[in-house]
Amino acid sequence: MTKKKAFTPLPYLASIVFLPWWISFSFNKSLESWVIHWWNTSQPEAFLNDIQEKNVLEKFIELEELFLLDEMIKEYPKTHIQKFRIGIHKETIQLVKMHNEGHIHTFLQFSTNIISFAILSGYSILGNEELVVLNSWIREFLYNLSDTIKAFSILLLTDLCIGFHSPHGWELMIDFVYKDFGFSHNDQIISGLVSTFPVILDTIFKYWIFRYLNRVSPSLVVIYHSMND
């Protein structure tokens, strides 16, 4: 049983981390060409919602103004006006393709995230025994660490999550999650989450020290405060 506890959790933990990612990645790559073909053939006209249509029109107007400005400066003859119209047409098609690719990316990312969630849910439902062994293995590993190493690890983790330089890391992480789920970048929402998450984590962490660590390991709390000061 001791040997099982020592070696079984390692491949199981690796499968929890890498298996959902590998299956989702394979699913994404295998269906990408089919989804692109289906989207381009079944949705020839209505490919934008109101917000996206507004964004496309704004970009198109900006593009048209740039072309007109270029024509006014260079004073091209009528032959170049025709080239100008062709250029506008090509750029419009490019904008349509770009937004279609955004829709396809959102659909694929949403599907792969659902698959990853389903796999992790299957682990939690079907792998109760393995999770118990993994939990006991982690507890035993943490218990064997010295209080100094524990305090250093807690201090390092808190500085990374709620320290002075943590907002930039949170901004990158939230932006990555936004892109992973297919959402467009929004500075207001990201700045709001960046200013909120560290405060919530700091409150939870202080409560955890006060409620749990003071009761379980007072010496660890003393070492942590000494290192933090």
Swiss-Prot record:
Its main location: plastid. It is a multi-pass membrane protein. It holds the Pfam family CemA. One of its GO terms (biological process) is potassium ion transport. Keywords: Antiport, Chloroplast, Hydrogen ion transport, Ion transport, Membrane, Plastid, Plastid inner membrane, Potassium, Potassium transport, Transmembrane, Transmembrane helix, Transport. HAMAP family: CemA_PxcA. This is Potassium/proton antiporter CemA. It comes from Nandina domestica (Heavenly bamboo).
